Structures are given as structure tokens and as C-alpha cells.
UniProtKB/Swiss-Prot annotation:
The keyword Kinase does not apply. InterPro entries: CcO_II, CcO_II-like_C, CcO_II_C, Copper_CuA, Cupredoxin, Cyt_c_oxidase_su2, Cyt_c_oxidase_su2_TM_dom, Cyt_c_oxidase_su2_TM_sf. Its EC number is 7.1.1.9. It catalyses: 4 Fe(II)-[cytochrome c] + O2 + 8 H(+)(in) = 4 Fe(III)-[cytochrome c] + 2 H2O + 4 H(+)(out). Keywords: Copper, Electron transport, Magnesium, Membrane, Metal-binding, Mitochondrion, Mitochondrion inner membrane, Respiratory chain, Translocase, Transmembrane, Transmembrane helix, Transport. Its cofactor is Cu cation. This is Cytochrome c oxidase subunit 2. GO terms for cellular component: mitochondrial inner membrane; respiratory chain complex IV.
Amino acid sequence: MAHPSQLGFQDAASPVMEELIHFHDHTLMIVFLISTLVLYIITAMVSTKLTNKYILDSQEIEIVWTILPAIILIMIALPSLRILYLMDEINDPHLTIKAMGHQWYWSYEYTDYEDLGFDSYMIQTQDLTPGQFRLLETDHRMVVPMESPIRVLVSAEDVLHAWAVPALGVKMDAVPGRLNQTAFIISRPGVYYGQCSEICGANHSFMPIVVEAVPLEHFETWSSLMLEEA
């Protein structure tokens, strides 16, 4: 969950998000070191009174500023490619959910069950109860079991949408007529909030996403109740 005036990422709730945060810190440190070096060189050049008018070229300097950036780019690219493949890998999901974007709500269908599906609308401000978050709460949450591979099939009924939950490190475009997929494993129980992340019309800001992760036995109880109500 995000906090007021927060500058960093939300707490990671999935292994992929933990990897993304580590990669961000790794890249940020490289950028910080390069910026410090450049600032030092500029300061030294501006403050010194020494000049050397006899150096017209330097083979050694050209070798260094060619090889060093290449090494730095490799140090960034290798972990980046690793995470890219991790995010795209979907092996033996325990549960598949189809998320459909509409103007302006989400509908969910649990494809492993025959009649388990529902629409998820934002709760209006006047209907909120104490402790609920404005513009983030929905009347039906997407409930999933924790510590289980979950596959989400994402599409849209009308215009472009995007299904995104920052704490899980997930963002997938919802394109009409096209079925995209993403996957995640939630590490701990909790309620995780997201929003449509593709401008989709007048009420784009009012189609939140709420994912609730519960132990497997609680999920089975919830799914049984939902099937009875269907």
C-alpha cells in the first residue's frame, strides 16, 4: 500500500517485484557513481588554473571512454534480461483468471470454475466505510490463494485499458480482440491495490483493482460461497 508523500516503491509482495526493486537499486547506484564522477571532473576543470596545450589526442583516454561505458551497459543489461525472462515465464499455474476491462470497471472470470465470475466496480465516496480508501475500493475483490502461481489473462471489451498492481510488479495492457497474459506469486496474505494504467476515457481514474491474497483453505471457502450465490 502506498503512503502519503512516498518517494520509493511499495513494499514488494511477490518475488518478481523484489527482483525489480533490487534491479532498480543496482541501476541507481551505477547512475549515482557516474554522476558523481562527472560532477567531480567538471568541478576540477572549472576550478583549476592549470592548462595543457600540447595534448591534441590521447589513445589511452579514448580506449577508456569506449570500453568503460560498454562494461557499464553490460552490467545493466544482464540482470535486466534475467528479470525480463522471469516476468514472462509462466509454468504450471494453479489458477487462471480472466480480467476484462470495460468503460469503466473490471470483470473477472475464474476459468477453472464453471460459474465463478463477477464485475468489480469502484465504491463511491459516499458509500465508503471507515478504514476504506477513496478511489481504490471495489465492491468485489479479486481473491486469490497466496504462495500459488496465478495466471491472469487480460483483455478489453471496448477500448485500451491496462491491468496493473504495483506491489506485485504487474502491468499488462488490455487490448480489445487480443488476449495478453501475465503471472505472479503473492508471498504473503494481504490486500493489494492497483488502477487502470492506460487512459481509457472520462472515468479512467475510477476503475481500481483490488487483489486479496488469502491462505488456500480460505480461498476454497470463498469460492464455494461464490458458487452457491451464482
